[in-house]
Amino acid sequence: SKTVHNTISATTAVSGDNNTENHGSSVTTTACTYPLTVTDATGTTVRIMSDPDRVVTLNPSAAQTMWEIGAQNEVVGVSRYASYLNGTASKQNVSGAGGPSVERVLAATPDLVLVPNSTHSASPDRIAQLRAQGLILVVFPQATSLTAVIEKTERIGRLTGNCAAGDARATELQQSINRIERVTEDTDRPVGVNVFYGYTSGNNTFIDEIIETGGLENGAANAGLSGFVPITDESVVAIDPTWIVIPTSAPLPKTPAYNSTTAYQNNNIIRVETEHIQQPAPRAIYAVETILQATHPAASDEYQQLETTTPSANTSSSESSESNVSQTTARQMRSTPSGVTATQTNSPGFGIVHVVFTAIGSVIIVCIIFPRE
């Protein structure tokens, strides 16, 4: 099984008042100082002159991260798929037809725009328009692991002037993962498969690591599937998963192939909140916890005991109170995972896949979109 070991290490070089971050495979942990120069996922060098007060998030995972580090008051614009977060009703909706609305983003007058890899890939012209208007944009790489989620949490804190809070939440995530790995070290690992709208999560995806950290073997990855790809009935029969992991927003497949699996025969269906399993953001740890409780309840109890008795990360900087608020909020919202059942959310969330119906004249086009951030 995969492990997600300690990954937090300083990689920032500082020269005078110019703080330069080169985003690599590890995360930065020095204090927030400005000007800050970063190289984003497109290779673009971005210079942030001062602590941004107004932040627009073009994807819900970045918005979720801002909420998780206690910086939601700095967010002035969100996508429609971030509506599940408390307080987004007062934020500018920056979504438009087929991607972000250039006009709405400009109307929010942001100091910084956080851009997902998927949005840049799908709408490079709109991103170019925003940059041409003088806005500061940082494009994130595709998150293919829980380590990437941890790194992005720290990096968003750093970019937005919330270094201590970002570092603390990133460290807390790593500690939780370490504890889960500790309690599952000697457990059996039945085969599980994540399914949504006929697709699955193979190797080289953060959902693969969610599944495996939660105590399962990812049958799709073991079958040689990589990325977010269709899964055939033949593959389902061949894998014969013991557990099916499915987001709350997706319908449960009802085909003879699925009905024949060990998972269906034993009602081993794990419903996980969509915004937990399909967004590479801090709440992904709750997806891991849900899977762990369903598949290894004794290990889950041991983990919960460790979570409540082991001191968490905190800071001694001027931002420590903000960090502590962030951690407290995260703990308060963490309810005991529901295992094989879960409550359907009213909002669509922002999954790895969502179905968009676009009417052009009298023709309805159905598009399946794979946001990756």
Show the residue positions of the predicted features.
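Secretory targeting signatures
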Residues: S1-V38, R47, N314-E373
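Extracytoplasmic ligand-binding site segments that recognize negatively charged/polar headgroups
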Residues: S123-D125, P141-R155, R189-E209
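A short, structured surface patch at a secondary-structure boundary
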Residues: C32-T39, T45, M49, D53-Q129, ...
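N-linked glycosylation sites
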Residues: N18, N22, S26-T28, N86, ...
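Basic- and aromatic-lined ligand-binding clefts that recognize polyanionic substrates
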Residues: R54-M66, N162-E217, E307-N324
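His/Asp/Glu-enriched short active-site or ligand-binding loop at hydrolase and phosphoryl-transfer sites
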Residues: S79, N204-V229, R271
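Structured C-terminal subdomain patch of bacterial secreted/periplasmic proteins
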Residues: C32, T147-R155, D167, I246-T341
